[in-house]
Amino acid sequence: MLDASVVQSAIRIPQSAIQWWHQAFLVRRPSVSLGLFRLAVAFTVGAHMIPSFFEMDENYLATAFTTQNPSFFPLWILRLVAGSPDWLIWSWTLVFLVSLATFAVGLFTQASCLVMTVASYYFYALNNYHIGTLSFDILLVTLILMCVTGFHGDFLSLDSLRRGDVRAHKRLRPFFVQRLLQQQLVWTFWYTALNKISAGGNWLIDNPYYYLIRYPPIGVVRDFPLRNWLGQHPTLCYQLGLTLLAFEFLLPLLWLIPRTRPVGIALGVAFQLMLWATLHVPTIFLFLFPPMMLLFIRPEAVVRWIEARQARQAARGRAVLLYDGQCGFCLESVKRLRVLDLFGWVDPLDFHAQPDLSALHPSLTPERCRSEMLLLEPNGRLSGGFYAFARLSLRLPLLLGCAPLVHLPGAAWIGTRVYRWVAAHRDLFHRNPTCATNQCAIRQAGNGAPLQGGAGGSSKAWS
């Protein structure tokens, strides 16, 4: 019979492995980093694909000279895509642009990612022309991991705004997507290094970097200032090649060790900039790899940084946004505003709860507070209506994308009129059936008395 201690030790090993697996991949952690990484992925895909659309007749339409990649796609897919009429190609172009935009802003994030991924590889199957296969292979793995879940839509997205999730940056999700993205980057670097010393690689016994330096100017190497000088020093080129090889092996280790991560991330970003400055490498390496390195930062550290910013803002003093707490539409708007106010710059205040409005600002009156939202900044500046929104767009990080639009010449003229129209027709935007005839009707209790906290008879338009 087996010794009981042997059996126990045999059981203990799988249990420890299960615990490690759970800690590494399944433990629930904030998904804030994935929301930020989504923006980098959207930018990378757009930068990779959109320039090719400027020459549709040369790249994709029936007039284009196309090449295909049978080592990447099955032949039946290549034949199917090759038969696409021009109208279908234009339709896929529109599908790609719409899905890219919705993915970037985080609207129906997972579905948008799926459609964007299919559209991207439709065009790659149509013509692979100058697009490097390696870059599309790397991008495919990243996009598939992003398609698996919608976790990247938890933060910095219209999806979180629709949910009214004030704690979106703290939302806990299984960590496996972020962990797999980390592993993708680690193994990409190690694969590149191993390829230099195996499977025909000769960086240890030969001097490939020296040969690259001496290629014609139109080759792989850019015409950077030290190129001609390096071409005259083959020994130095060999030493630089060995240094590069060692760097590609060691850099992922710096990311994996918590204490060395800051140094590893800084070196990794500098390395990508150096590659871009000296070699004609695919832009995906510069646009995607540095954000992937930032995924090694603990998401809890990102949350703590956000909370520290909120605490500093509270100590300096917040702006006050006056709204009508008896207006259902206003309450919903304030709920969305809290999602946009990541760093706690604004303190919403129901003007009904302020007995003396003039104590806040001499020009404040109940009538004005009912007619428009009012923003009172710590320096005493008071803005109302569209102008209050314009000021918010400069202060709230999640509204910064609107700032250039609302400050264009003529935007104030249009914006004030749109605001007034919304003020007059806000019942069209409210799902509550008690809102009718542009008034928030007072719901009556069984004895005929108005319910406290119900929708009041306010003409307040926008909060």
Q: What would you call each of these model-derived segments?
A:
Residues 352-448, 462:
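Thiol/selenol-based redox catalytic cores and closely related redox-interacting motifs
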Residues 2, 6-7, 14-355, 368, ...:
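Alpha-helical membrane-anchoring segments
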